[in-house]
């Protein structure tokens, strides 16, 4: 019934607005979906474990701030890392990607550890880490005399790497981060469906006791799922900072 309603809605919209079914509209929809696909892939693993992750948005915000700090232009008067020399664009981008993955992975590891070790519900654990992560964000925005101001002035190499035009179809541009989102989706599909870790994840999500009896390391699996989710949030933060060209505390 839901699919029928969706089809009816799409057909009605096309009839009432002929611009809905256009390359421009399709490119906009694809770009919007791709910009949030990494965070969805991360939370997907947590949902398979019959849990959730309320800290996802804040981790994206924190890692976006990390990306902005590392990739601000050197000529900015209020550059947070003003005392440090500007790295070559390629090296700075790689460093930012690694930094966001590490920061996101650490938060994810903390989530997974407390969920697995103390048998706490993910809702409670991730609510706590959400608040703690936001506190860290507020502190980060006070660094270098920034005084809580939005971080902008990002290097053009960074924004082009993420938001530059990958291809034009019918006059509508698709940015590079659409390709990155597809790569992440394929990678996560492979991990979930073609690896022992993925099979263990589904086993733990179905029945932890049965999985444990079958020889699955439940603790390790839960921690790894949340850590992987955190890494995906970090990559989403890297994309989001460049996509918006600015990062704020919200």
Regions found by a protein language model. Give the residues of each.
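Helix-loop-helix hairpins and the membrane-proximal interhelical loops
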Residues: 1-34, 238, 242-248
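Single transmembrane alpha-helix segments in multi-pass membrane proteins
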Residues: 10-14, 23-79, 113-120, 210
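Interfacial loop-to-helix junctions that mark the boundaries of transmembrane helices
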Residues: 23-31, 83-94, 164-178, 247-250
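Alpha-helical transmembrane segments within multi-pass membrane transporters and channels
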Residues: 77-130
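Helix-loop-helix "hairpin" substructures at the membrane interface of multi-pass membrane proteins
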Residues: 92-100, 107-111, 170-247
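Transmembrane helix-bundle core of multi-pass membrane transporters
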Residues: 122-195, 221-224, 243-249
